[in-house]
Amino acid sequence: MSYSPSLKEIIAILQKYTSKNYQSNCKTRPDGKLELSLNGVFEEIVKTPGKTRYVTHKQLDQKLKDFKQDLMVELHDTFATKTDLKESEARINQKLEALIQIVMVQGEQIKVHGEQINKLTQAVEKQGEKIEAQGQQIQKVNETLNFVVESLGSIHKRLDSMEGRLDSMENRLDKLESK
């Protein structure tokens, strides 16, 4: 977007080249653009403050060229009219409503996901309780198996001692028979 001078800036440029304050008229045209007119500008441009003198065409052309160059503004964009602004406002409102709808839908989806997460959390807690109960059962079975192993170990010791006694009894019987 290019720079566009204000009315005050234009009057300041005019005062740079001239010595009096000009009466300005600023009107809004039907197409929405501004029309600016300044009374008495070109008569004063060729005069030096306090003195009146003749100027050549070349000097006049140069002064007018300098003056126009200072006033020259490149306009690549046109100024928006009220209808353009209203249309733009309507488009913005439509986009805003669409975004609000999207946010509302996403909010509902978040609520649904939150409920699903709560259900999954409850299911995981139940499974955790089941796993804990199974762990306790396994621990009880393990304790029972350890007790059985200890019992079998003591039975094995008894059987070993009984076997030793039986062997010694058998040896005695063999000695008695051999005599």
From Swiss-Prot:
Coiled coil: none annotated. InterPro entries: DUF16 (IPR002862). Pfam families: DUF16 (PF01519). SUPFAM superfamilies: MPN010-like (SSF144266). Disulfide bonds: none annotated. It comes from the Bacteria. Belongs to the UPF0134 family. This is UPF0134 protein MPN_145.
